[in-house]
Amino acid sequence: MNAKAFLAIFMIALLITDRAEAGWWNAFKSIGKKLLKSKLAKDITKMAKQRAKEYVVKKLNGPPEEEVAAIDALMNSLDY
C-alpha cells in the first residue's frame, strides 16, 4: 500500500473514532504549539526572515560593482 494512502486512511480513521481513542491528537497539537512558541523556533523563524530579506535585497539591487566590472571585462575580451 502506498504510504500516502495509508496515512490518509489512518487520519480518516482517527477522525471517525471516539474522542477517547483519538486523545493523543490533542496531546500532539499541544506539544506542537509549545514547540512553535519555544526559543529555538523563534530563533529559526528570525533567521529565516533575515535570509529572506537578504535574498530580496540582493535580487532587487543587482550584483555588486566588482561582479559587474568582472562581467564587463569578460564581455570586452569576447569582442576582440
Swiss-Prot record:
Secretion signal, residue range per the UniProt entry: 1-22
Record has Lipoprotein as a keyword: no
Annotated compartments: Secreted
Record keywords, A-Z: Secreted, Signal
GO cellular component: extracellular region
Entry similarity comment: Belongs to the non-disulfide-bridged peptide (NDBP) superfamily. Long chain multifunctional peptide (group 2) family.
Protein name as it appears in the record: Venom protein HGE029
Species this chain originates from: Hoffmannihadrurus gertschi
